[in-house]
Every structure is written in C-alpha cells, then in structure tokens.
C-alpha cells in the first residue's frame, strides 16, 4: 500500500515525530501519508475510529488504550527492545540504522545563579527523581524504558547531540 497507508501524527513540521517519520520512510523506502492533529485526543480517536492505519505516539500517553487492548505497539524507536515491549521489534531490527531522537525536558536556572543554589537544586531534583512515588509515576507512563535522569553534564551532552542531529536533518529537509 505504498503511499496509501496513513499515520496520525503531530502537525508541527520539524517536530521530533515528523523528523523520525522522515528517518523511517527513507530507511524503509516507504511512502506514508501523515495525517496531522494538534491534540492527542483527535489522533487517538482517528486510530480508534479507523480513519488512519497507525499512530505515532509515546507509549505513556496511550497506556490506557494499550492496557485495554485497543492499541497494539508495532515498532519501538530504540536501539534495544525495552523489557516492557519485549515482543515489539526496534527500528534497527527492521533494518533502519538512524539514531533515535529522544524527547527531553529539563530545569534551568539563570546564568548568574549562585553556585551553591545550583548545587542544592541539582541535589533536590535528583533526590525527588529517586523517590518511590516518582518512580511509580514514571513506570505508569512507560518513562523507565530508558534512563530518563541526566545530571548537568549528561543533559548538556544529550542536548548538544540532539542539536547536531536536528541541524543535519533540518538542512536535508530544507527547513
């Protein structure tokens, strides 16, 4: 069904999801029509209602559909299979060699923040991250499929690597 298959995706050109779909379609030699939705609910409804063939989404956002058996994962965008999706192939297993882009968020301080305040905040955030209640929340959203905590050096490395990836892709896409 080359060119006739449809996938619900976010509408923002240049988004992580759109860039990843570019990687997938180029690596697999596919044409897939991406149907844009700004909000999650219409994307999920499109798959539930049969208006699209597939959905690009992070698993935590559709957990209730996965748990209810209404959605089924068919591909993970990780270098290795996460244990919670042990029966779902990775993009690499399907012959795609691109490095996955990761969604990330962080905490930032003013550039002139005192060093002792920065150190205390780093300690507090790491301590909060390690709390059982937060780990349970992370597990409920499938946010433990990768190591999701980064210290300052790790965050800088992730951000800088992501910038380089996006820069190359945006240039190739003409953005």
Question: What do these predicted regions represent?
Answer:
Residues 1-42, 91-93, 104-139:
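Hinge/capping helix and adjacent helix->loop/strand transition within the periplasmic-binding protein
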Residues 12-16, 39, 54, 58, ...:
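Extracytoplasmic/periplasmic, Sec-exported soluble proteins
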Residues 30, 116-175:
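An extracytoplasmic/periplasmic, membrane-proximal ligand-sensing/linker region
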Residues 41, 63-64, 82, 107, ...:
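Short secondary-structure capping/turn micro-motifs that flank functional sites
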Residues 75-111:
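Periplasmic-binding protein-like
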